Amino acid sequence: MARYRGSRVKVIRRLGLLPGFTSKSSNKPQNNNKQLSQYGFHLQEKQKLRYNYGISEHELIKYVKSARRKRGNSGDKLLQLLEMRLDTLLYRTGFVPTVASARQLISHGHINVNGKKVDIPGFNCSISDKIVINKEILKSLNDKNNSFSTLNCSHLVLNELNNDLTITVTNLPDIQVLGYSINILLVLEYYSGK
């Protein structure tokens, strides 16, 4: 699947701050003078979700359809599906700055899930999965980033044994605690006809 390779600051200027997309910020103020139509609001929220999680349009459609099939609030189910992706879980631990850098670590084969090497960034983790980061890459990450933090992530537990970092998924993420600036209902309305 094709990923966005263009200027990240232009996207930040257009859509606002997206912490999973980039840690950069725009020096120019966000232009709010444009009047958007109803469709424009829906499209903007959908694009925020896509860029923040680094997924393609086709992947997002599959996640929306899967969330609709599950019982409960479709918006919460959609965010839970996206938050349980392996690249997002690594980003939430705080040792990589963006979801894209987590994708790179995974695709280079530095991550093991339940004792098996996983090189698919969109791998869906489940409760009680153990994610282990290889020792060599952990040392270089420690040099760049002094501390790991699972801020707003009560569903992840970090353990460090024998220079290995183990992340355990204890339960589903609490969507209210994560704090999103994305209106998920507008995204679901955008895909209501599809």
Swiss-Prot record:
Sorted alphabetically, which keywords does the UniProt record give? Answer: Chloroplast, Plastid, Ribonucleoprotein, Ribosomal protein, RNA-binding, rRNA-binding
Where would you find this protein in the cell? Plastid, Chloroplast
Gene3D superfamilies, sorted: Ribosomal Protein S4 Delta 41, Chain A, domain 1, RNA-binding S4 domain
Q: What is its main location?
A: plastid
What SMART domains does UniProt report for this protein, alphabetically?
Ribosomal_S4, S4
Domain of life assignment: Eukaryota
All copies of domain S4 RNA-binding, residue ranges: 84-144
Q: Which GO MF terms are attached to this record?
A: rRNA binding; structural constituent of ribosome
Q: Name one GO biological process term.
A: translation
Q: Which GO terms describe its cellular component?
A: chloroplast; small ribosomal subunit
Please name the Pfam families in this protein's record. Answer: Ribosomal_S4, S4
UniProt entry tagged with the keyword Iron: no
* Keyword Transferase annotated: no
Q: What does this protein do?
A: One of the primary rRNA binding proteins, it binds directly to 16S rRNA where it nucleates assembly of the body of the 30S subunit. With S5 and S12 plays an important role in translational accuracy.
As for family, the record states:
Belongs to the universal ribosomal protein uS4 family.
Q: What interactions and quaternary structure are annotated? A: Part of the 30S ribosomal subunit. Contacts protein S5. The interaction surface between S4 and S5 is involved in control of translational fidelity.
Q: Which HAMAP family is this protein grouped with? A: Ribosomal_uS4_B (MF_01306_B)
NCBIfam families (UniProt xref): PRK05327.1
Q: What is this protein called?
A: Small ribosomal subunit protein uS4c
Supply the source organism for this entry: Bigelowiella natans (Pedinomonas minutissima)
